[in-house]
Design a protein with these regions (language model features):
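Short Pro/Gly-enriched coil loops immediately N-terminal to beta-strands
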Residues: 118-125, 212-213, 223, 253-256
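An extracytoplasmic/periplasmic, membrane-proximal ligand-sensing/linker region
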Residues: 180-184, 190-191, 201-214, 219, ...
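Bacterial signal peptide processing site
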Residues: 32-34
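N-terminal secretory signal peptides
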Residues: 1-10, 18-28
Length: 323
């Protein structure tokens, strides 16, 4: 997305600040937003991780662009499932989540607490990481193995369980099951305390790349189970991790899932529009926060189905061609 001319940038900044102050109309829609009832709190993710990096950058962008007295609070969390619990429970006003988890949580929720999307951010790819010198090649080889499926509260533990079910193993078919976050799983694989671990993140994920720099790894190819998973859960798609991403022997077929930026229906249209408008004004900063965010743009950002876009976000996308 190309940057705005300086005069336009100043005009939009003034409009954005007015949106949170509740005193001006935003763009062609001429809406009159009100200030948030509570300070912005963003449910982020684990450290190190793309979620927490993007959440911190968004907090800085919103503080600067919207003239807030202080940066929004960023919460370190286990990931998507916890983020959605925080959002729907009112402890967070903004959250990042995998779209599958968001859609599951949103089922049956109506009214002010209904989760609504501001934007599709980027796509996560599920990694199943093993040592390259191991005999593990497919999910079926993990039968009886020591495997970390990710921590409770993360978005990738449900994916791990669905993949294992599709492979005919299930969680009970593992030899030992651990629920480790990425740093702990990384350390356990290095120390030979586990044989494999699941992780879902942008490509490349820094923690996996650092591991691959010190320990030759392989990602299990998921091609033999992807059709079965997608038949049951069409929200997923097929992704590929190129060989040069982590120095792999070859490209690997993986499961892909979209990540979305969310608020609830309780947020007024002007504030929602101001948040996403400011984010796109500084999209290059998001890309600097994580290589995964390079793909964020206003054309792909509307792809949040089955989670509906917030009306304020719709206003932004409908008028984005004017920017």
């Amino acid at each position: 997305m190309s940057g705005p001319r300086s005069t336009l940038g100043l005009s939009r900044r003034a409009l954005l600040r007015a949106a949170l102050a509740g005193g001006a109309a935003l763009g062609a829609t001429a809406c009159t937003p009100s200030a948030p009832a509570t300070p912005l709190v963003i449910a982020g993710g684990v450290r190190p991780g793309v979620y927490i990096s993007l959440a911190g950058t968004l907090a800085d962008i919103w503080r600067e662009r919207l003239g807030l007295d202080g940066a929004p609070q960023v919460l370190t969390t286990a990931g998507s499932t916890e983020n959605m619990q925080l959002l729907t429970g009112g402890a967070a006003t903004v959250a990042i989540s995998q779209v599958d988890v968001a859609a599951d949580v949103a089922t049956g929720i109506t009214g002010p607490g209904e989760p609504m999307a501001l934007a599709r951010l980027y796509d996560d790819v599920t990694h199943v990481v093993v040592r390259r010198d191991s005999d593990f090649r497919t999910l079926d080889d993990l039968r009886g193995a020591r495997v970390s499926i990710g921590p409770a509260g993360s978005g990738y533990q449900p994916i791990a369980l669905r993949l294992l079910d599709a492979a005919g193993i299930g969680a009970d078919g593992l030899g030992e099951r651990a629920e480790l976050g990425l740093p702990e799983a990384d350390a356990a694989l290095r120390a030979d305390r586990i044989d494999a671990f699941f992780w879902s993140g942008g490509v490349p994920t820094g923690g996996i790349r650092d591991l691959a720099d010190e320990l030759p790894i392989r990602l299990l190819d998921l091609g033999d189970v992807l059709d079965r998973v997608r038949q049951r859960f069409p929200v997923y798609s097929v992704g590929t991790v190129p060989a040069n991403t982590y120095g792999l022997p070859g490209p690997v077929a993986c499961l892909s899932v979209r990540n979305v930026l969310l608020v609830t229906a309780a947020m007024d249209d002007g504030t929602a529009r101001a948040l996403i408008d400011a984010a796109f004004l500084d999209q290059p900063r998001l890309a600097q926060a994580s290589p995964a965010a390079v793909t964020i743009d206003s054309r792909s950002a509307i792809g949040t189905q089955p989670v509906p876009l917030h009306p304020g976000a719709l206003q932004f996308y409908r008028s984005a061609k004017d920017y």
